[in-house]
């Protein structure tokens, strides 16, 4: 599953990655964090000077070694590592296209209130729709401005104005 944390809000409290970790379950069940601005996923791009073909051969070689090792030790975490390498390789090609919302119609951007690349909750809602269209089964959107310990009357409109419209748009768009 994919996790996205938006920027902005009244009181952007930190959110720990343990909230989408697998805990005591196998690590294949943990979430993949997408950054809401900048590079969508850390360390998915090829190193400088490495072509996609070279990277593909490297992933195949590592997979072969991991499969050989797994026949000996039969560790579920090895199978998870193989799947993670393969997923990262596929993501190198698919994530840039996913994150490019420049071809979205203007009325869709307006419906969400999204400004591409700003890292807002609205932009993340639009990306969530695009992820769902590509088969991602679980998408968790965090908006970090909801930790109210006071000032509800003063700040509720601010928080709702950042989330109501894009949430409605996402539901309508699905």
Q: Where are the regions that the model predicts?
A:
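Ligand-binding pockets and gating/stacking loops
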Residues: 1-174
């Amino acid at each position: 599953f994919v996790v996205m944390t938006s920027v902005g809000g009244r009181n952007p409290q930190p959110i720990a990655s343990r909230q989408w970790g697998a805990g005591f379950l196998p690590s294949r069940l943990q979430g993949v964090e997408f950054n809401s601005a900048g590079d969508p996923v850390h360390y998915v791009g090829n190193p400088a000077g490495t072509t996609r073909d070279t990277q593909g051969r490297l992933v195949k070689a590592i997979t072969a070694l991991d499969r050989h090792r797994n026949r000996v030790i039969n560790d579920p975490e090895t199978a998870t590592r193989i799947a993670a390498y393969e997923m990262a390789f596929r993501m190198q090609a698919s994530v840039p296209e996913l994150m490019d919302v420049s071809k979205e119609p203007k009325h869709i951007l307006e419906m969400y209130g999204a400004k591409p690349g700003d890292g807002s909750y609205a932009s993340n809602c639009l990306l969530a729709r695009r992820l769902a269209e590509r088969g991602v089964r679980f998408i968790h959107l965090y908006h970090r401005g909801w930790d109210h310990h006071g000032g509800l009357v003063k700040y509720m409109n601010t928080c709702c104005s950042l989330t109501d419209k894009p949430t409605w748009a996402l539901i309508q768009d699905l």
